[in-house]
Amino acid sequence: MTEGIRARGPRSSSVNSVPLILDIEDFKGDFSFDALFGNLVNDLLPSFLDEEADSGDGHGNIAGVDGLTNGHLRGQSAPLSSAPFFPEVDGLLSLFKDACKELVDLRKQVDGRLNTLKKEVSTQDSKHRKTLTEIEKGVDGLFESFARLDGRISSVGQTAAKIGDHLQSADAQRETASQTIDLIKYLMEFNGSPGDLMELSALFSDDSRVAEAASIAQKLRSFAEEDIGRQGASAAAGNATPGRGLEVAVANLQDYCNELENRLLSRFDAASQRRDLSTMSECAKILSQFNRGTSAMQHYVATRPMFIDVEVMNSDIRLVLGDHGSQPSPSNVARGLSALFKEITDTVRKEAATITAVFPTPNEVMAILVQRVLEQRVTGILDKILAKPSLMSPPPVQEGGLLLYLRMLAVAYERTQELAKDLRAVGCGDLDVEDLTESLFSSHKDEYPEHERASLKQLYQAKMEELRAESQQVSESSGTIGRSKGASISSSLQQISVTVVTDFVRWNEEAITRCTLFSSQPATLAANVKAIFTCLLDQVSVYITEGLERARDSLSEAAALRERFVLGRRVAAAAASAAEAAAAAGESSFKSFMVAVQRCGSSVAIVQQYFANSISRLLLPVDGAHAASCEEMSTALSKAEAAAYKGLQQCIETVMAEVDRLLSSEQKSTDYRSTDDGIASDHRPTNACIRVVAYLSRVLESAFTALEGLNKQAFLTELGNRLEKLLLTHWQKFTFNPSGGLRLKRDLNEYVGFVKSFGAPSVDEKFELLGIIANVFIVAPDSLPTLFEGSPSIRKDAQRFIQLREDYKSAKLATKLSSLWPSLS
């Protein structure tokens, strides 16, 4: 039987004689309609398939015929004969009708089976639902039973816990009562006769039960002391009942505790000698019951070799100060302290390991140890190197002075601060090691500002004495210097030195560094910095002011020489030497003062730069401190400015005096009124002009170098104005003809060219007006009225110059000008 169709018997050529049988199993699984259809029709179409096979390649097969391999008809068909084109159509129709009928029957069978299954499923579902409902009811009942059971268990547990608590409390009370009985028994033993410790229980003499004995003794003493305290309070209230107290017990307990403590300390020391850390730890633990173990801690620290060995202290001194009798330097002391403090830190670190292994409270022991190190060992070496000097009679500078003490103090403070940090890292418990370190220097820091200012004053005085000694030595070695050259010995030897001012600043900067080190609070730091900087301002102000005054003295000496020249000029023989001396003195003093001014400016710039770089930032955090220091700096330097101003005025007087001398001595009356002898006019400036310009160029070279900015402009402007007035006054002494007027114009050109280097517009303008006025000597008399038509402001000066014309009277210029310029008549 093939897939999809089962034949009941052999099949004939007539397809209607044999019905089809379809099985429901054919429709299960991977059902294929094409396969079912092919199995139905393959037996009815054999001739058609053969014709298709014989028709040759290229036509192909009827779609679906080759694939109809499933199913077959019952019986074999007869060979096809020549008949109609598709004779199997009737057979196929009959086949399809039978197939449809059987398919309908199969569907009815399937529907019947489905209805039966649905009924069975419904019945089973009802049974399951009923079963689940019953199960849920059972579970709910079970949960209720569990809840009741849990409540019962909790109740029983609470009852058991209460019973346990009662039992524990009863046991504790029993234990307490037992201990109390024992304590009362022991207390009665101690409350026997005073000082009698021979009848005590074996517990108090058994070395193996020392810890227990110590604990009981402490409890008994506490109880006895409290009882005595209560009796004392009752007696004070008037409710005391006469009776014997526990005073004897307290005394005996105290004696016993002292004896036991000493015994434990002895055992602790013996174990310490053997480095038996286990026994040491046991003793320390027992001793902790006596005053929290303070005696054991202090005893351990006090017995350290670095505190009891005299050689350790001597070694410390040699390490820091060197050999006996040598003068220690701060650098050597710094190295020595670093080495010593490193050794101390290493020793403390080793002790820390032992303390941690031995004591139950190592932090407390470390606090005691570090405190002892700072207060004994460090303080001992600090006392050796920091001998506070007296401000009334300070040590001389040759022996280091106050500066040596301050440097030692700074070095010691820095190294001790580093030691404190190292000890803090090792461990020092609750000890405030930084605060303790500060307390070691409190007496020094309290008076530090006074010592710092006194040191700066001492350094300044020593420097001034050194400069005076050098000046005197040079003066004595040089012998008597003649005054003919006009040199001032004191001025030349004591000129302002920028190097000296730099030393002042260097001292102050070092002091500020120490001040920053010792002053932790901003307000304190600002106050100390301000005071120290004020010392620098005073020193620089006094030094440069005195230097300027010495330079002014040189100018005054030159002025005195000029006075002697004026007095002696009537004597022809003495006039020349006096004039040379006055000129040399004036020029030398001028240059010396300009050098002083230049160095003064450089010194002030150094101070101002130092203030901006180092001082300002330390004062800004405190309101008003920076402004106050700026005002003090301005006030201090104003004294030097006043001295410089007076000296510059004297310089101008000196220059003008020499210019006046040169003009008076070198200017000839014939320079501006040459005779008409047929000789060509001289186109050169006059000799007096050449000498004056050469002198001014030479002497003012130092002024151009020394002065700058507004100071330079003001000085040269004043000098130019004074020169213009002097020339006006000088030229009014002469009579001018046209040739002399041309000579004057050449002089004026020289002067104008020189004063242009001043960079002073007002001076240039005045000299240009002089050039215009000088034209009155050149033009013809008839041209004079039109000469100043555009410049009415200079007519008055022009009239004075017109009067100097050689032809002023002969040409009756006065009458002509009075009619033209009536306001000038």
Curated annotation (Swiss-Prot):
It is found in: Cytoplasm, Cytosol; Secreted, Extracellular exosome. GO terms for cellular component: cytosol; extracellular exosome. InterPro entries: Sec10-like, Sec10_HB, Sec10_N. Residues 244-266 form a coiled coil. The keyword Secreted applies. Pfam families: Sec10_HB, Sec10_N. Keywords: Coiled coil, Cytoplasm, Exocytosis, Secreted, Transport. It comes from the Eukaryota. GO terms for biological process: exocytosis. Expressed in seedlings, roots, leaves and flowers. Disruption phenotype: No visible phenotype, due to the redundancy with SEC10b. The keyword Metal-binding does not apply. PANTHER family: EXOCYST COMPLEX COMPONENT 5 (PTHR12100:SF0), SEC10 (PTHR12100). Component of the exocyst complex involved in the docking of exocytic vesicles with fusion sites on the plasma membrane during regulated or polarized secretion. Involved in polarized cell growth and organ morphogenesis. During cytokinesis, involved in cell plate initiation, cell plate maturation and formation of new primary cell wall. Belongs to the SEC10 family. The exocyst complex is composed of SEC3, SEC5, SEC6, SEC8, SEC10, EXO70A1 and EXO84B. Interacts with EXO84B. Binds to EXO70E2. Binds directly to B1L. This is Exocyst complex component SEC10a. It comes from Arabidopsis thaliana. The gene is SEC10a.
